[in-house]
Amino acid sequence: ADYRPSKTHGQFLAGCPDIVLNTRYIWVSNLSYERYRSWLKFLAEYERSVKSKSKGVFILEVNEAVGALRKERGIHNIVWKDMVGRYDITMFALLLLSEWKKPDIYKQYVAELASALSADNARLCGALSAARLELAENPQQCLEKQCEKLDFPPPPAETSAKAVWEVQLKVLFPITEQFRQQFTGRYGSQIERLLPLQAVYGEVFDEPGTVELGTLKYLCDLGKLAVAGEDLRGLVLFHKTRNTLAHLQTVDYTDVEELLR
């Protein structure tokens, strides 16, 4: 007859008060559903039988959808998608980038890219964040490279391009509007003398602060506004950025770098 021990593995380990297991965290990753069930049985036996005040803590990472998880004594179920969202992933990326010697707005841009392109996958987000400048310069190429390293299937190029556009809209559009407000404030007296102004699409501007970038650039091209060279270069860049995003296209990195200085 086969030898059958009187105690299961869980019961035996629970009855050993001085083993190192009682002071450790044990993280078991990439479990299939079947392996998860086996571990769950072991942990249930261990939890019921342990006598020590100190006991091991087991973390089971299941890589498959397991449906409704059983509730066992001493076992807490954490469903990743219910606990960790885009905000958490973005904060994670910002933390990883916190010591990078770049302006805060630049670090925010790279963190938003890492978060959006990772589709809330923390491992991929971490890898993308670690790439730093490579991610900023060529998001698609960097994404494909990191997915290959981690053995993750890369998303379709259209999906990642849309994610990059959304990040640029989120980060670049507010600073574009900020520039417009500063420009109209700085040259308000000149603009006021030209009012009312009519834009290409028929919109009429009665106040300096409402004039949009296209009209401001048009006035400069006609020589009707005398502005500093740096302000004119900024106007051209921000107008180009606004138009690019408005046409659902992504801004080139050379322009992004200039915008985020």
Each predicted region: which residue ranges?
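Conserved P-loop NTPase mechanochemical-coupling segment
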Residues: 1-6, 22
